[in-house]
Amino acid sequence: MVTVNENYLLLKSSYIFSEINRRVEEFQRKNPDADIIRMGIGDVTRPLPEAVVEAFHRAVDEMAEEETFRGYGPEQGYPFLREAIAENDYASRGVDITADEIFISDGAKCDTGNIQEIFGLDNVVAVTDPVYPVYVESNVMAGRAGPADDDGRYSGLVYLPCTEENSFIPSLPEERVDLIYLCYPNNPTGTTLTEKQLAEWVDYARDSGSLILFDAAYEAYIQEDGIPHSIYEVEGAREVAIEFRSFSKNAGFTGTRCAFTVVPEELEVPDSSGRMHSVRELWNRRQTTKFNGVSYPVQRAAEAVYTPEGQREIRESIDYYMENARIIRESLERAGLRYYGGVNAPYIWIRTPEGMDSWQFFDTLLNDAEVVGTPGSGFGPSGEGYFRLTAFNSFRNTVKAMERISELSF
């Protein structure tokens, strides 16, 4: 008889954004004329850059001709894109990453969720709290997390609280951990680590034999000096870290799907007998078995991001969204609400008004301002009492939403 993978039964009842959509749809049914402004899920609103679109068209035209048609491509990605990434994202910052260490994929969400498959189920996983849910839920599905308590805290995971009290900077684990998920600039808090702070994590991983899974999907939004764009800017990180990047938020690829993961050649992990194995080879084996690669037109489109025109156009989009973030911050100040982030990231992390939990604040904004954000409790126990807004809507909608919120009394 077929049975279910019971690890799936340990998942909380709903992925946070599914619950948000359910509540919004219910509100819309009851209020069909409502002008709802969505500032919750981190989806972009500006179109693809012109340089990207032109490259996309050219690649599609190639696919229409017998001489230039392409079928299955390399699972790791076409060399032209891997080389462009190595040169523009890493060599330009003095970081030594080769094209062979770069794996093209259809999204950082997929890669951060799938990477755990190549590691043993007895590995102890540490996550910052609040945390992007994919890191937690993929390990729940795999069987590493154990059951959850009433607060949604899984017994088998190590949580590293990030709160106002520690300026949202997690402390190094006191107990042994093997896999450490870090995301900076951070989703959901919008905060960052300095090079010195990140170096403490690299040193910890080198001393303890841990491995850092570093999500840098929002690095393009860094505005201030002294904040690393890549963990590999820190000495020794090649020995202890995997990095995830995405074209979704910097180049508008949320619907186009393209990202990449960097697995350095030096990175090795032992089996139960102590024999060392290349993580790059393990990830390559996983990808060649379960993934057929990103389409040729999409990879040509991603390559165009690195042209002078592409760089100028994505900078315009990033500046557009960061102007939205400035409007959000200033409006929250006028409303008397405490907030964090929104300077080096497109996310603003709001402290909910006293006596109001994060879902109550969600319902207040939805019902009284017709604005949708994301309750902090959906990102983990330490997210309770906080609320996330994103800067990814249009300028007009951002201004309108913040005017509505400013009119509320808290």
Curated annotation (Swiss-Prot):
It holds the Pfam family Aminotran_1_2. The keyword Transmembrane does not apply. The keyword Transferase applies. Its cofactor is pyridoxal 5'-phosphate. It is an enzyme of class 2 (transferase). The modification N6-(pyridoxal phosphate)lysine is found at K249. Keywords: Aminotransferase, Pyridoxal phosphate, Transferase. GO terms for biological process: lysine biosynthetic process via diaminopimelate, diaminopimelate-aminotransferase pathway. InterPro entries: Aminotransferase_I/II_large, DapL/ALD1, PyrdxlP-dep_Trfase, PyrdxlP-dep_Trfase_major, PyrdxlP-dep_Trfase_small. GO terms for molecular function: L,L-diaminopimelate aminotransferase activity; pyridoxal phosphate binding. It comes from the Archaea. Substrate binds at Y15, G42, K109, Y132, N187, N292, R388. Pyridoxal 5'-phosphate binds at Y72, A108, K109, Y132, N187, Y218, S246, F247, S248, R257, N292. Pathway: Amino-acid biosynthesis; L-lysine biosynthesis via DAP pathway; LL-2,6-diaminopimelate from (S)-tetrahydrodipicolinate (aminotransferase route): step 1/1. Its EC number is 2.6.1.83. It catalyses: (2S,6S)-2,6-diaminopimelate + 2-oxoglutarate = (S)-2,3,4,5-tetrahydrodipicolinate + L-glutamate + H2O + H(+). Belongs to the class-I pyridoxal-phosphate-dependent aminotransferase family. LL-diaminopimelate aminotransferase subfamily. Homodimer. Involved in the synthesis of meso-diaminopimelate (m-DAP or DL-DAP), required for both lysine and peptidoglycan biosynthesis. Catalyzes the direct conversion of tetrahydrodipicolinate to LL-diaminopimelate. Is also able to catalyze the reverse reaction in vitro, i.e. the transamination of LL-diaminopimelate with 2-oxoglutarate to produce 2-oxo-6-aminopimelate (in equilibrium with tetrahydrodipicolinate) and glutamate. This is LL-diaminopimelate aminotransferase. The gene is dapL.
